[in-house]
């Protein structure tokens, strides 16, 4: 097997949308039912995707809102971003659009590896954001999209596998662009 690659992923979103729950479900395989606001935590996990082993460093950020100022560290050495909203919260869906815009401004690129995640899909009776709305938003950003339930462990692993694939796809496009040569 090839040497493992290191990738750093930041998880961003509005308060109490399940960023930490999704991350802990992926890393430790358990759901934390209590809400304890995160300042910032970093987790590590080894995962194999398409035969390649990845050493992931996951930056679980504090909840942001439309007035949050992003620390510069959110743009340094980050290989991909998971943007999380709750399918039970219109506010979180609106704020994720603001977060996306601020992220693009901070990183200084139009296209970055992003995975949009609609979390809490197990709360059917409280749903206010449809799957189609989430998918349409992701498509408008040219981002990957999944809905998830950290509580029921639905697609937690898929979310992190997918962001790795998105990051690798962009890395491939970047390295292909670098290898081309023009003589004038």
Swiss-Prot record:
Phenotype when changing residue 139 to K: In a colorectal cancer sample; somatic mutation
Effect of residue 65 to A/E/N: Renders RHEB insensitive to TSC2 regulation, leading to impaired regulation of mTORC1 signaling
UniProt effect for mutating residue 15 to G: Partially resistant to inactivation by TSC1-TSC2
Gene: RHEB
Residues reported to bind GTP: 16, 18-21, 32, 35, 38, 119, 122, 150
Keyword GTP-binding attached: yes
Topology class, membrane: Lipid-anchor
Protein's UniProt name: GTP-binding protein Rheb
Stretch forming the signal peptide: none
Mutagenesis / variant outcome for changing residue 53 to A: Causes slightly reduced phosphorylation of EIF4EBP1
Positions bearing Phosphoserine: 130
Tissue/organ expression: Ubiquitous. Highest levels observed in skeletal and cardiac muscle.
Keyword annotations of the record: Cytoplasm, Endoplasmic reticulum, Golgi apparatus, GTP-binding, Hydrolase, Isopeptide bond, Lipoprotein, Lysosome, Magnesium, Membrane, Metal-binding, Methylation, Nucleotide-binding, Phosphoprotein, Prenylation, Ubl conjugation
Effect on the protein of changing residue 35 to N: Dominant mutant, which can activate mTORC1 in both GDP- and GTP-bound forms
Sites annotated Important for autoinhibition of GTPase activity: 35
Reported effect, residue 20 to N: Deficient in guanine nucleotide binding. Unable to rescue RPS6KB1 from inactivation by amino-acid withdrawal. Reduces affinity for MCRS1
Lipid moiety-binding residues (S-farnesyl cysteine): 181
């Amino acid at each position: 097997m090839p040497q493992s690659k290191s990738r750093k992923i930041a998880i961003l979103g509005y308060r109490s949308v399940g960023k930490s729950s999704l991350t802990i479900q992926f890393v430790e395989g358990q759901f934390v039912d209590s809400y304890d606001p995160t300042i910032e935590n970093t987790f590590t996990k080894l995962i194999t995707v398409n035969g390649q082993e990845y050493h992931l460093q996951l930056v679980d950020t504090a909840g942001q809102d439309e007035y949050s100022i992003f620390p510069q560290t959110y743009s340094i050495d980050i290989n991909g971003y998971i943007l999380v909203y709750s399918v039970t919260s219109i506010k979180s869906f609106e704020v994720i659009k603001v977060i996306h815009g601020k992220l693009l401004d901070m990183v200084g690129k139009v296209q970055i590896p992003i995975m949009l995640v609609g979390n809490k899909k197990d709360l059917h009776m409280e749903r206010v954001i449809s799957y189609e709305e989430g998918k349409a938003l992701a498509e408008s950003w040219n981002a990957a999209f999944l809905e998830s339930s950290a509580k029921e462990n639905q697609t937690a692993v898929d979310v992190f596998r997918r962001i790795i694939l998105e990051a690798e796809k962009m890395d491939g496009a970047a390295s292909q662009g670098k290898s081309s040569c023009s003589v004038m």
